[in-house]
């Protein structure tokens, strides 16, 4: 079972997201245990202070080291992965999600204000960012990471095929999806999906996935392993796009 402990000054933010859908089912099945801790419970002064002014001056407040150290020390085990959600961390992606899903215990520390005291870095194992933009705190990044990681835990998703076919699972974007009706306001489902020819459908889906990736996220093609068929399909795609111009 994967255990995830989240340390935050706003525990109420996590009440909704973890009580519905796949995250709730994963907990109900006993595959994942998620607990949220209020950082203020690890303070020792009557005001439950978690932040203070920065040395050297500057705007904003900085999260104090003492409560974070105390929280981590009370929760940490030998095999714990202690993660600080930080703009300066490694950019979160599917590969990191897969790595974390294989861990036994994750501790997520949600930063706030102008950041955390630099000395906190001495007790964490990695820093993670979810993107190059500014957020109010680490709570939303923590939710993103938990959602991405939990769905990869064996047994969480009912259909293993859905996990294998998802975007990024094979390093590229997913092929287009269609459902009923067959014709909606003149927009029709591609005939090949109605052909019943599984090999042609498979090839069409792979080609469409490669095309979408080539047009929207070409950087992904440089990072993934492509088969000979993929390379041939990409040449077809490039030729077709040139002919459209």
Swiss-Prot record:
Report the protein's function: Specifically methylates guanosine-37 in various tRNAs.
The record's NCBIfam families line, in alphabetical order, gives:
PRK00026.1, trmD
Keyword list (alphabetical) reads: Cytoplasm, Methyltransferase, S-adenosyl-L-methionine, Transferase, tRNA processing
Protein's UniProt name? tRNA (guanine-N(1)-)-methyltransferase
- Localisation: Cytoplasm
The gene is trmD
Family from the record: Belongs to the RNA methyltransferase TrmD family.
Catalysed conversion reaction: guanosine(37) in tRNA + S-adenosyl-L-methionine = N(1)-methylguanosine(37) in tRNA + S-adenosyl-L-homocysteine + H(+)
């Amino acid at each position: 079972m994967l255990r995830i402990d989240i340390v935050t000054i706003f525990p109420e933010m996590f009440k909704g997201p973890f009580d519905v859908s796949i995250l709730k089912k994963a907990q109900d099945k006993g595959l994942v245990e998620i607990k949220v801790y209020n950082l203020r419970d690890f303070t020792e002064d009557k005001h439950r202070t978690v932040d203070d002014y920065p040395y050297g001056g500057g705007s904003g407040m900085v999260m104090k080291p003492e409560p974070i150290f105390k929280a981590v020390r009370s929760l940490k085990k030998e095999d714990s992965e202690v993660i600080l959600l930080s703009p300066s961390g490694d950019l979160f992606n599917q590969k990191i999600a897969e790595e974390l899903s294989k861990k036994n215990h994750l501790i997520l520390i949600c930063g706030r204000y102008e950041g955390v005291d630099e000395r906190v870095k001495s007790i964490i194992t990695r820093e993670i960012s979810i993107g190059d933009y500014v957020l109010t705190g680490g709570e939303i990044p923590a939710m993103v990471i938990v959602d991405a990681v939990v769905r990869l835990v064996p047994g969480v998703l009912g259909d293993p095929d859905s996990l294998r076919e998802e975007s990024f699972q094979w390093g590229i974007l997913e092929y287009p999806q269609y459902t009923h009706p067959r014709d909606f306001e003149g927009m029709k489902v591609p005939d090949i999906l109605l052909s019943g020819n599984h090999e042609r459908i498979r090839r069409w889906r792979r080609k469409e996935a490669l095309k979408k990736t080539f047009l929207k996220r070409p950087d992904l093609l440089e990072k993934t392993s492509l088969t000979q068929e993929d390379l041939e399909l990409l040449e077809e795609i490039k030729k077709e796009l040139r002919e459209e111009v």
